[in-house]
Design a protein with these regions (language model features):
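Local cysteine-cluster metal-coordination motifs and their immediate loop/turn environment
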Residues: 67, 71, 153-174
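Short cysteine/histidine-rich metal-coordination sites, predominantly Zn2+-binding motifs
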Residues: 158-159, 180-183
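Short hydrophobic/aromatic-enriched beta-strand-loop microsegments
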Residues: 149-151
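Glycine-rich nucleotide phosphate-binding loop and flanking beta-alpha elements
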Residues: 93, 176-177
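ATP-dependent adenylation/nucleotidyltransferase module used to activate substrates
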Residues: 1-146
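Short amphipathic alpha-helical interaction/hinge segments
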Residues: 116, 177-180
Length: 183
């Protein structure tokens, strides 16, 4: 098993550090994939790109993010001989971002399978163990599995500590509050 971390432009440094710490804690090799040309729609707008799809986009939206990331993950699965690509999307993601729902991944998987060499019959599939769970259920599962929640990062901002203002911080804080856990 390997973990992939996509380092796109303006990705929060604390998120990168959290990924590294979790991989180390889990004793999983992490490969950091530089994708400096990928950035959030709001940042692209600031650089002068029109980005029509970002007009009403949710916070953190990156155009075609999962098409790109999962295609790269399929490449790594191919060269390492892995049969599964595991994603961490949760129920709330599927309600916010169009490229996190199962129909999207069914279509993408079909394309990936069609792209594989005709002599390579190894199966490949996506696995999304958290896709039907909300943040509260995920935190409960994390506690049960003794996942070090303090190593995780949810903030969209690039600060030493979570901003507490972005939607991701607010959702995390609400879930922790409902479970009577101090953040």
């Amino acid at each position: 098993m390997i973990a992939l971390s996509f380092n796109y432009k303006w990705r929060p440094q604390q998120e990168i550090i959290a990924s590294q710490k979790i991989a180390e804690f889990s004793k999983v090799k992490m490969i950091e994939v530089p994708v400096p040309y990928i950035q959030q729609a709001t940042d692209l707008r600031l650089e002068g790109y029109p980005i029509p799809s970002a007009t009403n986009a949710p916070e953190g939206f990156i155009p075609l993010r999962n098409l790109l990331f999962y295609s790269i993950a399929a490449y790594y699965a191919e060269i390492y001989g892995y049969n599964f690509i595991i994603g961490g999307h949760i129920k709330e993601d599927t309600q916010t971002f169009p490229d996190t729902n199962l129909p999207f991944f069914e279509k993408l998987l079909k394309l990936i399978k069609e792209s594989k060499h005709k002599y390579d019959n190894r199966p490949i599939d996506f696995v999304f163990p958290l896709v039907d769970m909300n943040k509260i259920e995920i935190i409960e599962l994390a506690l049960k599995l003794k996942v070090p929640i303090d190593l995780t990062w949810s903030c969209y901002g690039d600060f030493a500590k979570p901003c507490g203002l972005c939607k991701s911080c607010q959702k995390r804080a609400k879930a922790l509050r409902e479970l009577n856990i101090k953040s």
